[in-house]
Amino acid sequence: MLMISNCSRDLLQRHFSNYHDPSASEAPVAGAGPSVAGKTPIACLNCSQAKTGCNKEVPCQRCQDKGLHCVQRYARRTSKLAARSQAAATAAAAQASRVAQVTPVTVQQSLPNVSVSIEPSQTLSQIQPPLVHEGGASVTMDPAILEMPLMNSFMKQQDPEVHDGSSPANSITFPLPIHLKAESPRQRTASVDLNFNNMNSEPSPPSIEPMEDQSWVNSLMSNDPNFGPGNMFSSTYDLGYQLGPSYADPTTDFSQMSQSMLQHDASMSSMEFAGSPSGVSPFGDLSTSNSEPSSSSWGSSHTRATSICSAHCLYDQSGEFDVTSNSAKQGLPISTDSDVILTEAAWPMARCTPPIYSGACPRTALGHLQRLEQKSSYQGARPFAWHTLERELSSLNWDNADLASVVPMNSQTRDSLMSISQRFHARALDIHRENDPGRDKSPLGSNCGPMSFLNLPSSKVLEFFMKSYVRSLTSFYSLVSEGRIDPNQMHRNDPASIILMLLMIAQGASAVDSEDARILSMGLIETCRISLLDIIDKNVEMSADPTALRAALLFAHLGAWSGDKWLMDIAMGQRGMYISMLKHAGMLTAQPPICPVLDGDQGQKNSWRLWLQVETKNRLVYDWVMVDQELSLFHDTDPQLDVSELRASLPCSEKLWKSSTVEQWADAVQCYLSKGNPHPLTPPSLYHLYREFLEQKLVDGRVGLTAHQLRLLLHPIQKMLCQQRQTLTCFSDMFVPDQPGHVSFSKAYVMRQVEVVRSLLSRWHDLAMRCLNMNPDCTIMRTNMVLYHLISLNAVTNFPEIESFARQERYDGSYWGSRHQRCIYNRQQAVHDCGQVFSILRNLPTDRLPTWWSAAIYRATMILWADSALQSQSQAHASLSPPEATEGQYAMNAPQDFNHTLDYNVIPYVTRSDGTPFHLDRHSEVLDYAICAIDQGASSRLGEGIKRKLIALGNNWH
């Protein structure tokens, strides 16, 4: 509770008697306008904004003269709300079916403080639930309210010095909301475990529909002066589930709820909240006296516009309390997984089923934010909000010995992180509600949204998600400097760093197979997406900030592989915008060579810091190159970046990058200088490396390439192949040979260009095998081989045509053999590459799989399925039996030489995980194998969506 000084208490009493005393509201006000339906008209909206006089007519004279649309306003005082509530309660009291006689209590008309007399020898469990009498109506107080710790705190914290003569020493006033209405026969009940002493026990979730009962709590938060975006620990508390069934009932009148009921006292300060890792209550000492009347949180409509708005939101025309949330009123139910599943047919990738388009897709972004907000409160018990997630993560024990370390997050960092993320989350909710077409367009509608509350998991869980982020992403992207992630050092109270940390948590949560982790991940992705655009719009210099662009990189990666149609579309669309920011910031251009100063401690430190800034930007550029390559590969689009623009230096060695001290870095630099490298801190750019690759200067093996450099070399090769493939699709199926005597631009010419690209891929394969033989267990290099085989598949197949065939589109009645040739140009090479994709991904550790691994399985599966289905259709139309394997069988997922042959009479087969083979002459078995492979791998929303698509494909072709 809150300590109120004598001066403030006198001022509060004077304010209450002037504006909220029911007796004062009975007398007519001189000069007031005529009352309309119990409402007192005041100045219209236009006049009030212009601060001019208004005759309070409809329309008023000023609006008529100026041709404005006049919007009438009415006074909404607490006394009028109480009068309407009392009138409605009196009408309902006539139909009361039962009346119980228990200890009488006193009900004040303005503030219904329930006074319960307690004998010294009487315990809380022996107190009879009071009955409120008002005009013949009766309502029982739920006994569960007297058992809750909040009630115990009110009884234990009474100060005997503040009692006056009107209240005995053992009489306690409960400022509880009492709805003067008979109980409904269908009144809901809930059993809530409120034993806060045993914090480690699993809570029993109430059986009440969460959002139906939580909407009034959000509305209370929006009108609480102590609650705001910057205050992460609200003084309000979700009482909808703690007050028992009689107070969680939607018919309960909370219009007169006292603010003191929503305060926590010092008796709860020793509890170890999930939101307070230090074990100290974040609510502090909030004790106050009960001898003075508390100001209603709904009052003072003339001092806060939110009071008018809250009344508009919480009460219907009859004055009854309405617990339906704004989202439900506006037709915006909380999004569930079914909404995300409905949008899977509109994905920009994996389009093997009949597509739908954006206009027919449900909106999921607002639902993700609301689900995160709902989960944060755990149906009214915030200390247990992420209890299930903590229990699930406690059983996981990952070995991160070979990865960057994560410094434990202290309580101060977590508190600040949650405070700023609360503001981000509220901003995101406001934007989505403002853009809702079904939203209330009245002047009061813009402020009627319930205030959100975002409660992050404990520091231990956040640390686990940081480790999950390191494990799932930093193996493929060089994002972590100095060999560790220190969230306490990263946090600088600037928005870009907070957004980056939240996206790290979202990435780590997305890699965990847990429903709670997915809720947290999807909510944070949408929150950070809007916040990132906000900070760049407000400060254009942030478009060149490495931290903001690194956060944009994480969002593009998370959104593209999220499995949510809207996030995938936005990530693909904003990829070009953020890449343009990189260009305009000058990060793609070459920088002057860095000459390290190794003499003196200060010189070494300055050189290290300067190099670290330049190296961070260079690694950010080439991380964007890898993301650009992945998104273009799996979405069948051109890469955004051009190799001729990539003049920034390639990343330096990992030994330099992971040096945690100046001494380690200086020793590593000295080691490279002693080996004859004159510029160890300024490697060549990707442009220069690719030029040497084209000139075959890298074939002799004198230049040792790292796994990351080989990965980057695939980007320009893939871009060249995309250009040739687009040109190839413009030709018809009819073969037109080149005319002798001059070079013509024909399909044969383009096919020769494709063969040139295949020769470059073969040259890259030789370099990669040399690197892989030196380190066979390198996860990065094995992932590079998967990308290589997928790019090679694009050189011998037409994947968009294969998906069109799966959707049974574009069939012009031509022969099936010609369509097979239109989908797969080189069957032998295609079958080999698909088998290698299966083999490599199956042998990778589950926790080291790349995020897009299920999409790679999908592409290989679709090519093998199309090959089998097209051959079956061709044989069926020709009335021929399938050929027998006369020349043996080909294990397509076994290691093979790059140059191989596969006869059409040979039936390829795949070896399952148990060692048993199955042949690929039946396209249904190909789909079954892929579905089982996805089930055995790391779980993700993307993988589950692809599995559903493959099942639907099998049903369509059954």
UniProtKB/Swiss-Prot annotation:
Claim: Transmembrane helix is one of the keywords in the record: no
Observed effect of gene inactivation: Leads to the accumulation of a large amount of shunt product scytalone.
Descriptive protein name: Transcription factor PfmaH
Keywords: DNA-binding, Melanin biosynthesis, Metal-binding, Nucleus, Transcription, Transcription regulation, Zinc
Bias-annotated ranges (Low complexity): 287-301
Domain of life of the source: Eukaryota
Annotated segments matching region Disordered: 272-301
DNA-binding region: 44-70
Alphabetized GO MF terms: DNA binding; DNA-binding transcription factor activity, RNA polymerase II-specific; zinc ion binding
InterPro entries, per database record: Transcription_factor_dom_fun (IPR007219), Zn2-C6_fun-type_DNA-bd_sf (IPR036864), Zn2Cys6_DnaBD (IPR001138)
Localization of this protein: Nucleus
PANTHER family listed in its UniProt record: TRANSCRIPTION FACTOR WITH C2H2 AND ZN(2)-CYS(6) DNA BINDING DOMAIN (EUROFUNG), TRANSCRIPTION FACTOR WITH C2H2 AND ZN(2)-CYS(6) DNA BINDING DOMAIN (EUROFUNG)-RELATED-RELATED
GO CC term, one of those recorded: nucleus
Regulation: induction: Expression is positively regulazed by the cluster-specific transcription factor pfmaF.
Primary role: Transcription factor; part of the gene cluster that mediates the biosynthesis of dihydroxynaphthalene (DHN)-melanin, a bluish-green pigment forming a dark layer in the conidial wall that protects the conidia from UV radiations. The 2 transcription factors present in the cluster, PfmaF and PfmaH, coordinately regulate DHN-melanin production. PfmaH acts as a pathway specific regulator to mediate the expression of Pfma cluster genes including PfmaJ, leading to DHN-melanin production in conidia, and regulates the conidial formation.
One Pfam assignment: Zn_clus
The keyword Metal-binding belongs to this UniProt entry's keyword annotation: yes
Biological process terms in GO annotation: DNA-templated transcription; melanin biosynthetic process
Cited CDD domains: GAL4
Species in which this protein is naturally found: Pestalotiopsis fici (strain W106-1 / CGMCC3.15140)
